[in-house]
Amino acid sequence: MTAASLVTLALSLSLAQAAGHAGEHGAPAPEVATPAEGHGARDAAGAATDPHGAAAEHGAAAHEDPAQHGAAGAEAGHDESLGAVMMHHVADGYVLELPGFCGGLSWACHVDLRDVFGTEHVSEIDAHGHAVERNVSGPLVFGKVDMTPTKHVVMMWIASAILLLVVFAAVRKKSLVPRGLYNFIEMLVQFVRNEIAVKNIGEKDADRFVPYLVSAFFFILFLNLFGLVPFAATATANISVTVMMAVFTFLITQYAQIRAVGVGGYFAHMTGGVPKSLWPLWFIMIPVEFLGLFTKPFALTVRLFANMVAGHFVILALLGLIFALNSQWIAIASVPMALSIYMLELFVAFVQAYIFTMLSSLFIGSVVAHHGHEDEHEEHGHGAAATGGAHGSHGSHVAGASPGHG
């Protein structure tokens, strides 16, 4: 898997480099229809009536400064092709790349998801002047909302399906001594429950949130690992995905706090514990506490997104040095370094899933445990009052008995 991924990245960079060179040496550009098509036809007719003038203009434009044009084109080709490959690798889109030989130099078959999930009706005039209607690829639109699945959405569907199959297959194999896949799944589930949920939320309330934490851990883990598979895509490198994962944690955290302290206690917490006698300070504490609600999901979003994007950019940058410096000797150092970063990314996939789950449980536990501590303090207060009353009554009895003894 590692070698195949690195070879795929290297081939994509080389093909992009070749495309850049082809563009520099006069590759024909695709024709694009514009509203000024009639003017173009008239200009073409004029050029046909005066071929010498058109040829002279073309020759002057083509041979104006060939050395300067070649140098600028080469530099722009290198920069644009390498940068485009790096952005294309992490960007979302409608085109899904599947393994297979589809002709030409490409080792991947490109499937346009707009052709699969949606069509668009277009009316046009044929060569005989008749109005015809045909179907072309277009977005899947409901009202004004584009609902066409992108490749990152497809990756999430595939990850969810594989996750369900793996978990159900592991759970069905019930035995006293777990082995193989069931042992591995059970180990991870027990780790999430005992080492993450219980330690951060507490034994009393942990099991209520374990299903979400386990689901988030495995879902993020599978998406991270998918990004290291050739022809796949890293959905967690899309900030829209990480935002929604953080939103789920945010909503569950608010639900846990309202369930623990009630609606009144939830809004009372916005004052930051400042008593009513110091109510002018509420104008400072309430905005601070309100912003604090959103800094936690923001941290979850940026942490996961930035780490996944950075790892892929480092690998692509190391492989891109071969083509940027135009020397095969660079591969002696860049390929082993890229391979080591790739192996590190396997570890990072688990680490980022763990960090997201751990921080989510920490945020949930901060609102649940705070309520538990308040109840505990109240119980201790009542106990201390009862104990103090008992000691007081005992002291009064002793004091009352003293004169008798005297």
UniProtKB/Swiss-Prot annotation:
Where in or outside the cell is it found? Cell inner membrane
Q: Which family does it belong to?
A: Belongs to the ATPase A chain family.
Compositional bias (Low complexity): 22-31, 43-59, 383-406
HAMAP family reported for this sequence? ATP_synth_a_bact
What's the name of the protein? ATP synthase subunit a
Disulfide bridge partners, by residue number: none
Q: Name the keywords, alphabetized.
A: ATP synthesis, Cell inner membrane, Cell membrane, CF(0), Hydrogen ion transport, Ion transport, Membrane, Transmembrane, Transmembrane helix, Transport
Q: Where is this region: Disordered?
A: 22-76, 375-406
| Gene Ontology cellular component list | plasma membrane; proton-transporting ATP synthase complex
